[in-house]
Regions:
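Bacterial N-terminal signal peptides that target proteins for export
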Residues: 2-18
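Generic hydrophobic-segment detector
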Residues: 18-20, 149
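C-terminal motif of bacterial Sec signal peptides marking the signal peptidase cleavage site
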Residues: 25-28
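Short loop/turn and low-complexity linker motifs enriched in small/turn-promoting residues
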Residues: 30-153, 163-188
Length: 188
C-alpha cells in the first residue's frame, strides 16, 4: 500500500530532494516515456546561455532550503529532452553549492529584493521565446521531510531583467514569484 508523500519521503532532507525531483518528473507536464526516455546526462545538464540574438537576463533565487532551479527553453512545461534545458542553481540545507551550475554567478542582473539569505544564479535567456523556470525544493521540520515543486512559464522581453524567487509559504507549500525589474531596481 502506498504511504502518504510526507511518510514516503521521511528520512534525510537529501531523500526529500530526490523525492521532490522524482515528483517533478512525474508532474502533469510529463509522461512515463518522457521521464525514462531521457538520459541521466540530460537531467544533470548545466544550462548554457544562448549565443547571439536578443536576450534577457534572469536571476533564479531560493531562500534557505535545499533546492534546484532549472530552465526549460521553448517549453511551457519541464521537458528533460529539450537539449537547451539545464540546471541554473542549487543549494543543500540552505547552503549554496558554489561552482555547481551557475550558483553564485553574477551578470549584474537587477534584483527584486535584497540578496541576503538567498542562493542565486544568473543566466541569459533568449528573448521572445517561451521558457519555463522550475524549482524542486526540500525541507524538514524535524519530524517530517517535505518536498515541493513549483514553476512558472513566461516569454522574456529583450534587455529586461527578471528575478525568480522560490520560497516556502507555510510548512508544506512553496511558491515562485517572478519579477520584471526596472533600471531603478523596482519590480514591475
Amino acid at each position: 500500500m502506498m504511504k502518504p508523500i510526507e511518510a514516503a519521503l521521511s528520512g534525510s532532507p537529501l531523500r526529500a530532494l530526490l523525492g521532490a525531483t522524482l515528483l517533478m518528473a512525474l508532474a502533469s507536464c510529463s509522461s512515463v516515456p518522457n521521464i525514462f526516455g531521457a538520459k541521466t546526462a540530460a537531467m544533470t545538464r548545466v544550462y548554457v546561455d544562448p549565443q547571439g540574438g536578443e536576450r534577457a537576463q534572469l536571476r533564479m533565487s531560493v531562500d534557505g532550503s535545499g533546492a534546484n532551479g532549472r530552465v526549460y527553453p521553448a517549453n511551457s512545461c519541464p521537458r528533460w529532452q529539450e537539449p537547451r534545458s539545464g540546471w541554473v542553481m542549487t543549494s543543500v540545507f540552505g547552503i549554496p553549492l558554489f561552482g555547481t551550475a551557475h550558483t553564485g554567478r553574477s551578470l549584474g542582473t537587477r534584483s527584486a529584493m535584497e540578496a541576503k539569505g538567498l542562493t542565486s544564479g544568473e543566466v541569459y535567456l533568449r528573448a521572445n521565446e517561451l521558457v519555463t523556470l522550475a524549482y524542486d525544493m526540500g525541507t524538514s521540520d524535524g519530524h517530517y521531510n517535505y518536498g515541493c515543486l513549483a514553476g512558472v512559464a513566461f516569454t522574456p522581453v529583450a534587455n529586461h531583467h527578471y528575478h525568480a524567487i522560490a520560497r516556502w509559504v507555510g510548512r508544506q507549500q512553496c511558491a515562485v514569484m517572478l519579477f520584471d525589474v526596472d533600471e531603478q531596481g523596482v519590480a514591475k
